Every structure is written in C-alpha cells, then in structure tokens.
C-alpha cells in the first residue's frame, strides 16, 4: 500500500493560489493525487490564505471551505506525542522556529506519510525527524 501524501504550506499555497509563481509547476507535480495537510501546516495555510494581499485574501469561511474541499482529512499529531512534545523536540535537538517544522514532520511520521515540501530550510528538520521527504517541483 502506498503511503499517504502529506503537504506543508510551501506546497499548499502555490497549489491553491493561481497567481503564485510556482502554481503551474506544483499543480503539474501534484497530478490530482489525494493529499493532506500535515500538522501545523493546516493552521499555517489557513493563516496565509486569510492574510494574503487584499485582492487575493480569502474570507475565513471561504478559506475553511477551500481547505476542506481540496485536501483529504488532515494528518494531525497524536495526543500522546503532544503530551511529551518538549521531550521529543529535545531528543531531536530542535529549537526555535524549527519547532513548527518539527510539528509538521512528527505528524507525517506518525501517519507514515511522505511529506512534500518546497522549503529547503524546513527539509533539514523534516529529515532530522526521519520522515520521507519529497521535493515538489
């Protein structure tokens, strides 16, 4: 059985926003496969969609509807991992802003998902967690 495909915000936004410079490339890469937002990327993608420049910004309900329609059920971090999150992060020596990338990677790892990204900086954290990373190009 093929592992689920998870995407982070760096893939979700160009997939959803037609005027994004990477839209065509990401849509071609995606090829209409079922994909799920992963961990913190769900909230982050919603945040970006609702704070884009005025002519592109979505109303909150429109953003929620778009995320529900375009993506499979989100892959979220288990309560067990969340309960021990500081210790888990410390074991991987993850600090600062990389914590948010780790939330995405930990959720992907728990669901045995491939994690698609376009973010070279986050990729290092994802790989540190041990998730299988795919570069969406």
Swiss-Prot record:
Q: Does the UniProt entry include the keyword Nuclease?
A: yes
Where primarily located? Answer: secreted
Top enzyme class, one word, equals hydrolase
- Write the Enzyme Commission number(s) for this entry: 3.1.-.-
Q: Which cofactor does it need?
A: Mg(2+)
The UniProt function text for this chain reads:
Probably the toxic component of a type II toxin-antitoxin (TA) system. An RNase. Its cognate antitoxin is VapB27.
* Family indicated by similarity: Belongs to the PINc/VapC protein family.
**What is the protein named?**
Ribonuclease VapC27
Gene transcribed to yield this protein: vapC27
């Amino acid at each position: 059985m093929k592992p689920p495909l998870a995407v982070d915000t760096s893939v979700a936004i160009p997939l959803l926003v037609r005027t994004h410079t990477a839209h065509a490339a990401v849509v071609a890469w995606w090829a209409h496969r079922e994909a799920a937002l992963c961990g913190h990327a769900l909230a982050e993608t919603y945040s970006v969609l609702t704070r884009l420049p005025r002519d592109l910004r979505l109303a909150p309900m429109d953003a929620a509807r778009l995320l529900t329609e375009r993506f499979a059920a989100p892959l979220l971090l288990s309560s067990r991992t969340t309960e021990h999150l500081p210790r888990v992060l410390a074991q991987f020596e993850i600090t600062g802003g990389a914590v948010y990338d780790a939330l995405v990677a930990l959720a992907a790892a728990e669901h045995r998902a491939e994690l698609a990204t376009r973010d070279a900086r986050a990729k290092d954290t994802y790989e540190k967690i041990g998730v299988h990373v795919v570069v969406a190009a």
